[in-house]
Amino acid sequence: GWNDNSIHTALSHLIVRTVYSPSEWATHRIMKENSAACELYSGNPDWTPGINALYQMPDRLFELKEPLERHLCNTTDHLFNIDNRIALFDLTNFYFEGRKAGSHKARFGRSKEKRSDCKLLVLALCINREGFIRYSSILEGNASDPKSLPDMIDKLAEKSPATNEKTLVVIDAGISTEDNLQRIKEKGYNYLCVSRTRLK
């Protein structure tokens, strides 16, 4: 379960990872030597989470991904009075230097950092015009850009139903196939994209 200690661990972990972008091992060292993040949440200047708790935290947070994203979206919408009239879709990938033998999604694919020797995962994001992430998906490393969009559009339709003032979906040329553009229209949205073909 989530007791006070695990909540303090999660919040401290997120702050240090966001500020410094280190590994879990480096996060633990920074917490002990160069950060008051742990004291900020626990109220105890001598408290630091154990290294094993830090390694386990990403998996524990990922189990709550859907409700966490929904809560963060609702909170930012209310706080900043956001209407989410524009939805930007984008994909990127990241590589692993280890073998990732136990992963069912890590695959060899087209690395944006030219690391053809490493397995990849693809991160798909839907972002509003204010820059807040509406939702995210982790896809297989060899997922092609066009094939990733239908699932994202379905999620958008579920979480942000079309209204009289239609949401504008912004996508890049890598995703804008005729089938995908048709799917966007069928869901009741407008779209803006770079054409994959010359104007006729």
Predicted regions and their residues:
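Short consensus segments that form the blades of beta-propeller domains
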Residues: 113-114
